[in-house]
Amino acid sequence: MVYRNILQLSVLKVLLIVLIVEATHFGVKYELWQPECELTAELRKTAGVAKMKVNSDLNSFKTLELTKMKLLTFAAKFPESKEALTLRALEAALNTDLRALRDNIANGIDRAVRATAYASEAAGALFSGIQTLHDATDGTTYCLSASGQGSNGNAAMASQGCKPLALPELLTEDSYNTDVISDKGFPKISPLTNAQGQGKSGECGLFQAASGAQATNTGVQFSGGSRINLGLGAIVASAAQQPTRPDLSDFSGTARNQADTLYGKAHASITELLQLAQGPKPGQTEVETMKLLAQKTAALDSIKFQLAASTGKKTSDYKEDENLKTEYFGKTESNIEALWNKVKEEKVKGADPEDPSKESKISDLNTEEQLQRVLDYYAVATMLKLAKQAEDIAKLETEIADQRGKSPEAECNKITEEPKCSEEKICSWHKEVKAGEKNCQFNSTKASKSGVPVTQTQTAGADTTAEKCKGKGEKDCKSPDCKWEGGTCKDSSILANKQFALSVASAAFVALLF
């Protein structure tokens, strides 16, 4: 009887041990795996975020480029105006923004690729770890606990974000949920240690400890240093029945020791991807953009350069910076809005590819192709204008040369013998002449007495006056016929002709500058 009681007691102890062991078969708590599935879904947005970021920079570049071309279009039509100088100065400042944005785009593509690679790796690791727990079921028992710990959580896995990747044909531009991915880390992935990650008991044998060496015992020999690592460190068991989760909430603070892990690198690459662009902010108007440009050093430097180029001075000669800013941009950029209104309402030619002479308002031109055609049109118009001016100058020079060659003075100067000179009705021989003068010179008095007209050409008339002015002292050299210059009394009409020719040439040169 005693033996039977002892045997029954032994059996009860064994059954109790089995029940206790079975009761310790903990799965993974819903609050542990659900945020990781949510993070998986957010990380998979990275390709769309990268597309949005690169497109945003490209659109900013395009917006600035169109603004630049509109400013240059007005300046091309009125190249010598004060407005044109101002617009070219704004364009110079805008070019600095374009260069910075171009560099940002080049770097942005690299950031986009890196962020997408790291985020994809992290999302894949999270999904595969939780999928392993999902598949550890026989239809009755399970390793993923549902919310509330009372049932199987497998059915909720997909709805929480853990499902096979399926990209659309066209990536959707997206943005992150900042409750899941913040500027510091992954806020919902806070640490769960010891027994904090245990799900429903008696359901999952995955984290069962081996009672001895793994070679001869089932389970994991945690006492020997073995551990279970799911999702590249997202779920880790270093002790029996204790699935844990690392701290990934703040990589600059509490999760600093995780910064060099896959998840830390994924977050760092995402942060770099989200850096602000250099271009205009969404919704920024042309006037706002131009006012910001007017404040840049490059705009003021351009004004000084253009003024120096048109006057022959050096840029360092222009020192009154505030006065220059006020003159061209207005006090606190007050001239900018009126300038832009004038630009956008101006009608220009060249936008129509079929009819270049057709006019269009600058505000209606919103493609690079249209604006480039306008710039080409005015480039051709300027070229033709310069060619016509060069032709007119050459013609004028020829006419002046012809007039000088046919003047009475020139005809007399050709005679080198005194008898022949004296025989001419309009010439007289001068024995004593100054250096560079001819002996045979025109004599208007003799020509008049001989009945020869002395107003044959403009130059001839001037030479008649030259005879009157010749030899006079400074006191007697008076206008309108004579003018004292270079120590001698000269015909003022000849000086006027020379000044006229010089002014024409100067005007042509100024036109070439712009």
Curated annotation (Swiss-Prot):
* Signal peptide start and end residues: 1-23
Give the species.
Answer: Trypanosoma brucei brucei
What are the annotated glycosylation sites?
443
Q: What GO cellular component entries does it have? A: plasma membrane; side of membrane
Q: State the disulfide connectivity.
A: 37-162, 143-204
Its name, as the record gives it, is: Variant surface glycoprotein ILTAT 1.24
| Membrane topology listed for this record | Lipid-anchor; GPI-anchor
Q: Where is the composition biased (Low complexity)?
A: 455-464
Could you name the domain of life of the organism this protein comes from?
Eukaryota
Please report which positions carry a covalently bound lipid of kind GPI-anchor amidated aspartate. Answer: 491
Subcellular location, record wording: Cell membrane
Where do Basic and acidic residues bias regions lie?
465-476
